[in-house]
């Protein structure tokens, strides 16, 4: 929702699918793009100055990304555990928004924030041509690790990115206890 700073107007709200869940924050760019990741889609919602829009003609979009199984602890749901992070500003050619996906062994996924370059071809293994690229995260874990998952936003500097793995080998079965134990 967007709320008038003087609290004189009714909040402007966008509702997603009844089967979707949003458990993270949103990011906002300098052109009124609002980036929200549900457990199924990464979205750009646009504030037009008078309303929130999910219409492509206003620059809005949605893209599927990879999901997985319910992890043993820390993260709720099967989608992303990260608030979208913006990457690329000013005169930088590539304006991206990045998240970690919900795959059991997560990927870092970069989506084109604005228009997809005309010569861009969808990367093999991605769910949409909105995905500029995605990379598997190993976090130094052995190849047979069942889980590599994060509940934090991706940290970026320029076009570099840093993520953490919040799943350990011996997790408590109780998610609350696991969150307390791991911080």
Please give the residue ranges for each predicted region.
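Extracytoplasmic/lumenal domain signature
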Residues: 1-23, 27-183
């Amino acid at each position: 929702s967007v709320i008038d700073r003087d609290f004189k107007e009714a909040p402007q709200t966008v509702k997603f699918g009844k089967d979707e869940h949003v458990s993270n924050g949103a990011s906002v760019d300098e052109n009124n793009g609002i980036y929200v990741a549900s457990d199924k889609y990464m979205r750009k919602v646009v504030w037009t100055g008078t309303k929130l829009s999910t219409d492509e003609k206003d620059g809005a979009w949605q893209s599927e990304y990879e999901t997985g199984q319910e992890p043993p602890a820390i993260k709720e749901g099967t989608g992303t555990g990260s608030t979208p992070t913006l990457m690329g500003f000013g005169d930088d050619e590539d304006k991206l928004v990045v998240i970690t996906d919900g795959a059991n062994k997560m990927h870092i996924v970069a989506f084109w924030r604005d228009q997809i370059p005309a010569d861009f071809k969808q990367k093999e293994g991605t769910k949409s041509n909105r995905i500029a690229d995605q990379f598997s995260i190993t976090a130094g874990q052995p190849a047979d690790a069942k889980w590599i998952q994060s509940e934090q936003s991706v940290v970026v500097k320029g076009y570099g990115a840093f993520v953490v793995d919040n799943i350990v080998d011996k997790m408590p079965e109780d998610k609350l206890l696991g969150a307390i134990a791991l911080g």
